[in-house]
Amino acid sequence: MLVATAADRNKDPILEVLRQYVDPAAPKVRALEVASGTGQHCAHFARALPNLYLVPSELDPRSLQSISAYISHWSLSNVEQPRTLDVSKSWETWGFKPNSLQLIICINMIHISEPSCTQGLFKGAGHLLQPGGVLFTYGPYSVNGILTPQSNVDFNLSLKSRNPAWGVWDTSDLQNLATACGMSLERMVDLPANNKCLIFRKK
């Protein structure tokens, strides 16, 4: 099993926000996690929220193996085996029916992937979420053109030096993308380490 120290640090703060969007009275909340990474997040969320039925996904083979290992280690009956998913491809290739998901989770992908991935994520969410469903993202964001603190500015420069197509997105650009996909930015939640959860809801 792969271990990311950042995932260990942020899994509890993210969970405290996420649980507000998983109705405890609902028998089953079906969710897709895009870019699941090591599998630490989906395992943590599934153990804490037994009515959350998660489908993790990744493109990297080592990550896919790690996710499967976490599922086995914790004997998670509410997590499916991970799917190989390229979020930059059309939502029709993702293997879900339109309006079939109540929640899509995406943690720490948007700033470290090409714009086609973020655009694909929002287009997919617009088609696959049920009306009233939530796209839940986490990471660093600038707000109305302002990126703070300096550590996030430095991080953004570091990302762009590795790949000019990478970098921190502005919330207004994501809001415009959401609007074009039939969603709206409902809430921003500040979390530790200068990151935020953004909650987009499908109309």
Swiss-Prot record:
CDD domains: AdoMet_MTases. Signal peptide: none annotated. It comes from the Eukaryota. InterPro entries: DUF938, SAM-dependent_MTases_sf. Belongs to the UPF0585 family. PANTHER family: METHYLTRANSFERASE-LIKE 26 (PTHR20974:SF2), UPF0585 PROTEIN CG18661 (PTHR20974). This is Methyltransferase-like 26.
